[in-house]
């Protein structure tokens, strides 16, 4: 298992309190394959550096998890299928 950080930017029209529960259903992919979710940190509404899908701001969330690479790839694929998710970025902390 490897450690990952996933940054998710969601549509700013969503309610901030609904972000964590909506992400939780996607996190079941990680849990089902034996991975663990360390934390889900919702940063709230922030301004984007440039417009993405005609949005000048978005709701940021950072997810720290441990999982196999194939599981994280499937998790990211499912997130990108959701229309309310503007952008995702998967990172490996200290992977050098």
From Swiss-Prot:
Belongs to the bacterial ribosomal protein bS6 family. One of its GO terms (molecular function) is small ribosomal subunit rRNA binding. Pfam families: Ribosomal_S6. InterPro entries: Ribosomal_bS6 (IPR000529), Ribosomal_bS6_sf (IPR035980), Ribosomal_S6_plastid/chlpt (IPR020814), Transl_elong_EF1B/ribsomal_bS6 (IPR014717). This is Small ribosomal subunit protein bS6. It comes from the Bacteria. The keyword RNA-binding applies. One of its GO terms (biological process) is translation. Keywords: Ribonucleoprotein, Ribosomal protein, RNA-binding, rRNA-binding. It comes from Nocardioides sp. (strain ATCC BAA-499 / JS614). GO terms for cellular component: cytoplasm; ribonucleoprotein complex; ribosome. Binds together with bS18 to 16S ribosomal RNA.
